[in-house]
C-alpha cells in the first residue's frame, strides 16, 4: 500500500514539473552586441559597340531583303539564296510522258500533250497582322476599340461584329458603294464579302520606295550535309556567304524596277462556264492571295528545266533535281529610299502555269470521228527548301561614342 502511494506522488510530481513553462531565446547566442557594417565599392562600367562579322542565317522561318541605313550602325543590305524542291516524278498534263511516247491503240485520248509554259511567277508573301482580340472581324490595328466587338469603326450605325456576321465590310459605311449606307441598305449583294484588308508588318523604311529586283539561277549545289565533316553533320550557311560575288550564278530570270503592293491579289476565272448563262465567271474571283512580292520569271528557262524533263531521272529524287536546277539568288539594288523587309520565306514558291492538249471524245470513246483537241491549263508549284541570307553591313564611316556608364 505504501509503495502505491509513493508511485502516485512521483507521477503527480512529474506532471507538475512538466507544466512549468520556461522560455529560452532560441539562437540568441548567435547575436552579437555590435551592429553589422558593410563597405561600398564603386567601379566604372564600360560599354562599347563590337561588330559581328558573320552569323548563321539558314534554318529560319523568315528572310531579310532590302537595304537600310541606321544611325550608328551604318548601311545594311540583304539578299536571299534558296534551293528549290519538287514532288517526285510529277505528271504534267493528263498522262505520264512514258504513256504519251508509247501511245495507246485502245485509247484515242492518249496523245502528245505538248505541254507549254504560259507564265511563271516568283511569290514571297509578306507577314500580316491578324490580331483580333474581340473577334469582331476587324484586326486590332484598324479597330476603333479592339476590346469591344460592338464598336462601330466605320460609323455607319452597325457594329463591327454585326457587319462581319452579315457579310458586310466593317471598315466601310457603304460596303457595295451604291451611295446607300449599310444600316439602311437592303441590298448589298454586289459586295464581295471575301475581299480582305490586310495590315502588313515587318516592313521598315519607305514602303513606297522603288528598287531593282533581280533573280538569278544559282549554279552552286546546296548540300544538306556538310562535305567538310564527311557528311556527318548538316551544312550551315552564314551571312557572309555570297555565291553571286563568287560567280556561282547563271541565267538572269528577272531584272526590273519594282514597287511593293500591299493589296490582296485577286484573279478571276479564265473561262466562262456555259452552264451558268446568268453569270460570267470571267468577272468573278477564282483565286485570292495575301499581299506578297510577285514577279514574272523567264518562261523559256522553266520550259527547259521543268516541263521538258517530265519522265526523266531529274525528278527521281531530291539530289538529282538539285543538281539539275540548283536554286535561285534574289538580289535588290538601286533603292531610291531605304526599304528593308522581313518576308515569309517558308511560304515562298515558284508557280509555273502551263497549257496542254487534251482530247475531247464527246462521249464516244469508240468513235474518233467526232474527237476534238482542246487547250487545257494547269499549275505546277516549286517550293523553297534550304535558304539563307547574305547580309552586308558597311559601317566604315560610322563612329561610335564610347562612354563610361
Set out the residue ranges of the language-model regions.
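Secreted, disulfide-rich extracellular signaling modules
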Residues: 2-137, 141, 179, 185-405
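Extracellular calcium-associated, cysteine-rich motifs in secreted modular proteins
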Residues: 132-192
